[in-house]
Amino acid sequence: MTKEQQLAERIIAAVGGMDNIDSVMNCMTRVRIKVLDENKVDDQELRHIDGVMGVIHDERIQVVVGPGTVNKVANHMAELSGVKLGDPIPHHHNDSEKMDYKSYAADKAKANKEAHKAKQKNGKLNKVLKSIANIFIPLIPAFIGAGLIGGIAAVLSNLMVAGYISGAWITQLITVFNVIKDGMLAYLAIFTGINAAKEFGATPGLGGVIGGTTLLTGIAGKNILMNVFTGEPLQPGQGGIIGVIFAVWILSIVEKRLHKIVPNAIDIIVTPTIALLIVGLLTIFIFMPLAGFVSDSLVSVVNGIISIGGVFSGFIIGASFLPLVMLGLHHIFTPIHIEMINQSGATYLLPIAAMAGAGQVGAALALWVRCKRNTTLRNTLKGALPVGFLGIGEPLIYGVTLPLGRPFLTACIGGGIGGAVIGGIGHIGAKAIGPSGVSLLPLISDNMYLGYIAGLLAAYAGGFVCTYLFGTTKAMRQTDLLGD
């Protein structure tokens, strides 16, 4: 049995056994477990399992085990359950243990009602953030892969211009790499439309068509469509993904209404046709111009804050981004990043935000040095630090800095210092989203690699010094405990 399989089985035992698990799924770093009875979960045992870097209680119990490991752990849990990831796990009861389904249903409804009430205050915001995450998180591997391939093409192109390399085959290779990159970035509106349709309950194919509509692929030469508000020609992609998401949301409403009123015999023909016609026209003549104005204004405001605020803005963004990640609010910036890339070829917000993770790495290094007697902490750091350098910060957040308290605050200060350096230098952008930390380096635009490295080093140093001096307690240094 592999260590990942052992980890999976220990997690199952800690959450009350397979009989207490309703379903299992995973993201990039966390196994997400929906349990039937929270009272059967042994939280302390779960947190102290070797390999578990943190535990978050939400709608699902989220067990942080790190990238790579998470897929193997989740897949083994799915194998043991006999169902696919995300599917409900059937629970069989023998005759001597007959289940009172009526009572069970009533208890389940009561629990769901209480959970719903507990989330009423932030319900709408949580729903928006969850929708944004569900639309874009599946695209992150494509962003990373396409972005890195585009970064390699840019490096090769620069080397050719400088005269270090030459040859027709190099030119062809650069062309091929750029074609692969554009396979994602040029058709992002279509991918966004498909995922938005899944999120809002529309037909994914129709969502892709609406996304593709914004590209105006049928417009050429004199067949120009005009912006009904300004009288200027509409531009392909105007309104960006903000317009696509809103249009697909309207599509979901229209399609659902049509399904209710169109006879079943002709539903497959009439509903998609009318839905595309209505929403397509609205998208071209209403949503694209309005969303274009919104996205242009949003990007202008963000760029203005970064360029005018400089060091101050950089510090505030870098210092506050880690708490936003902790709360899951960082997903709200994904559409902004993408719009900045669409309009100017780079997002100048991402390199500053990436300093938050670098500050946390510096804090973790200080903990490694200061807390030599704390073997539990050092064992956790062994798994969380390497991926932290690569920009995956959740294992450090939930497994180290947040449970300890003080190091989380000093890590934020380190992130602010790195952000101040990036903001002070200025014009340091990223050509794609997805990675951060060292992994973001190949995606830095306009050859501003040294500026980004300077920011990373400043964040590492700031997080290290602040944590070394102020971020530990006697208990952290002399006991073998992690958090409370």
UniProtKB/Swiss-Prot annotation:
The active site is at C27 (phosphocysteine intermediate). One of its GO terms (biological process) is peptidoglycan turnover. Disruption phenotype: Cells lacking this gene show an extracellular accumulation of the disaccharide turnover product MurNAc-GlcNAc, but do not accumulate MurNAc. One of its GO terms (molecular function) is kinase activity. Residues 130-484 form the PTS EIIC type-1 domain. Residues 5-87 form the PTS EIIB type-1 domain. Its main location: membrane. The keyword Ribosomal protein does not apply. Its EC number is 2.7.1.-. The phosphoenolpyruvate-dependent sugar phosphotransferase system (sugar PTS), a major carbohydrate active transport system, catalyzes the phosphorylation of incoming sugar substrates concomitantly with their translocation across the cell membrane. This system is involved in the uptake and phosphorylation of MurNAc-GlcNAc, the principle peptidoglycan turnover product of S.aureus, yielding cytoplasmic MurNAc 6P-GlcNAc. The EIIB domain is phosphorylated by phospho-EIIA on a cysteinyl or histidyl residue, depending on the transported sugar. Then, it transfers the phosphoryl group to the sugar substrate concomitantly with the sugar uptake processed by the EIIC domain. This is PTS system MurNAc-GlcNAc-specific EIIBC component. It comes from Staphylococcus aureus (strain USA300). The gene is murP.
